[in-house]
């Protein structure tokens, strides 16, 4: 039987990788036929360390590349830290 593969897009920061790995372990524990692969990504927000986030697009810079990976079928789901997700009122 061929395992089903689920790809998780995640940032490469230690926190993001820890969270994605945690989700990976939980999914594989609950679904024995599921193989979960992490797709670590460098985001524009992580590259622009010398510029205030507000000047270059805000917190959304940390999630846009992951969302693009979903749209381009390079990942099936994304794991984000809520601190990186923009909030709109």
Swiss-Prot record:
Its cofactor is dipyrromethane. Gene3D superfamilies: Periplasmic binding protein-like II. One of its GO terms (molecular function) is hydroxymethylbilane synthase activity. GO terms for cellular component: cytoplasm. The keyword Ligase does not apply. It is an enzyme of class 2 (transferase). Monomer. This is Porphobilinogen deaminase. The lineage of its organism: Bacteria, Pseudomonadati, Pseudomonadota, Gammaproteobacteria, Enterobacterales. The gene is hemC.
């Amino acid at each position: 039987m061929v395992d089903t593969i689920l790809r998780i897009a995640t940032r490469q920061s230690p926190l993001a990788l820890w969270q994605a790995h945690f989700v990976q372990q939980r999914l594989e524990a609950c679904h024995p036929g599921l193989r979960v692969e992490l797709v670590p990504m460098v985001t524009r927000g992580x590259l622009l360390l010398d510029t205030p986030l507000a000047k270059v697009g805000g917190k959304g810079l940390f999630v846009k590349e992951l969302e693009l990976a979903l749209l381009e079928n390079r990942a099936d789901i994304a794991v984000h830290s809520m601190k990186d997700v923009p909030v709109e009122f």
